[in-house]
């Protein structure tokens, strides 16, 4: 999030952008979204497993539907845990690959000077105020929305091409 905050603050104040690239920010935002969705899937499928097992073992309902629900929920739970663990390990590996200089540079961007201009004060302390952290979250959500919108645009283009070729 610090990366996205630095890039967008730099673009607004018009100096040269730091070493963070927009693709790194998009990758971080996508990883965060996948982590959040897989965590939600783990909780949802786990709770569905518990509820269906409780109904199944209480003996008050038909066995087959709840048995199917239980097996499907358990399969979803296992898959969601696998996805969650893979993404967590990817995030940990990307954090380990970052050098200490990059981490310090991200923590203290006011020390860096490029092309004679200093970065703006709001990017110099990205954690100083709640508005800067909100700005980072807003930019991450905006990039996710742009990615989803671009994907839907591509799907619509493909659908329109296939319709025009089918006639």
UniProtKB/Swiss-Prot annotation:
Q: Residue numbers for the site described as Interacts with 14-3-3 beta?
A: 166
In this chain, composition skew of type Low complexity spans 122-134
Specify where it is mainly localized.
secreted
PTM note says: Phosphorylated by chlamydial kinase Pnk1.
- In its keyword annotation, does this UniProt entry include Repeat? no
Record field: transmembrane: 37-57, 63-83
Give the record's GO CC terms. extracellular region; host cell membrane; pathogen-containing vacuole membrane
Disulfide bond sites: none
> What UniProt keywords apply to this chain's record, in alphabetical order?
Host membrane, Membrane, Phosphoprotein, Secreted, Transmembrane, Transmembrane helix, Virulence
Localization annotation: Secreted; Host vacuole, Host pathogen-containing vacuole, Host pathogen-containing vacuole membrane
Q: How does it sit in the membrane?
A: Multi-pass membrane protein
Q: Which residues carry this modification: Phosphoserine?
A: 166
Region Disordered, residue ranges: 97-136, 148-167
- Indicate yes or no for the key word Secreted: yes
Motif Phosphorylation-dependent binding motif residues? 161-166
The entry's function note states:
Inclusion membrane protein probably involved in early modification events of the chlamydial inclusion. Binds to the host cell 14-3-3 beta (YWHAB); phosphorylation of Ser-166 is probably required.
Q: What is this protein called?
A: Inclusion membrane protein G
Protein's organism: Chlamydia trachomatis serovar D (strain ATCC VR-885 / DSM 19411 / UW-3/Cx)
Lineage here is: Bacteria, Pseudomonadati, Chlamydiota, Chlamydiia, Chlamydiales
User: Its encoding gene is what?
Assistant: incG
């Amino acid at each position: 999030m610090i990366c996205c905050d630095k890039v967008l603050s730099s673009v607004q104040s018009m100096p040269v952008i730091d070493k963070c690239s927009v693709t790194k920010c998009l990758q971080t935002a996508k990883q965060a979204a996948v982590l959040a969705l897989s965590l939600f899937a783990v909780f949802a499928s786990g709770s569905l497993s518990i509820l269906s097992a409780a109904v199944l073992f209480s003996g008050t309902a038909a066995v087959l539907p709840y048995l199917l629900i239980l097996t499907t929920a358990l399969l979803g739970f296992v898959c969601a845990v696998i996805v969650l663990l893979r993404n967590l390990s990817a995030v940990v590996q990307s954090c380990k690959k970052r050098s200490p200089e990059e981490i310090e540079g991200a923590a203290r961007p006011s020390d860096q000077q490029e092309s004679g201009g200093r970065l703006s004060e709001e990017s110099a302390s990205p954690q100083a105020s709640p508005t800067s952290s909100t700005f980072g979250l807003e930019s991450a959500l905006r990039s996710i929305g742009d990615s989803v919108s671009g994907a839907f645009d591509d799907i619509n283009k493909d659908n329109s091409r296939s319709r025009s070729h089918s006639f």
